[in-house]
Amino acid sequence: MLALLLGSCESTYYDAMEQIGIHKRDILIDRIVDAQEAQQDGQVQFKNALEQFRSVVNFDGGELETIYDRLNGEYEDSVSAAEEIRDRIDAVESVADALFDEWTTKLGQYWSANLRRESERQLKNTKSRYTRLLTAMRRAERSIEPVLATCMTTSCT
């Protein structure tokens, strides 16, 4: 039931955006850029967390609680970055699904068989490129979990 409700909300959103001249393909492009930026930000965050961890490995005394708080903060920021990446990729997937559904529906509206075949070819090529992009994004997302798990088990929290 919730999926049906959320799907209709997204459909309403896309319809409203199209009314003001912003098409699903434009939303898709924006969401891909947002996801890529989130991945880059996440990469920076993980690098910062690693640097903080390395500084503790060479720890020679001092305020243990301060160091723990700093490491825990880096870990929490890394978890947030991972969630942001996941959310951005999910948003890309959502608008892409809506775009491809609309495109498929419109194929049945062509009067010309040649134009329909050309649009089907473009749809197939676009889906193929999108699938490669989404696969790469999901692979990058999956690579984050082992880093977080390692950080969690090696005194980052």
Please give the residue ranges for each predicted region.
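Sec-dependent signal peptide recognition
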Residues: M1-L2
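C-terminal motif of bacterial Sec signal peptides marking the signal peptidase cleavage site
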Residues: L5-S8
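Bacterial signal peptide processing site
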Residues: E10-Y13
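Primarily heptad-repeat coiled-coil rod domains in cytosolic scaffolding/tethering proteins
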Residues: A16, H23, D30, F59, ...
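Early exported N-terminus immediately downstream of N-terminal targeting peptides
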Residues: R25, I29-L107
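Extended amphipathic alpha-helical interaction segments
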Residues: R88-T157
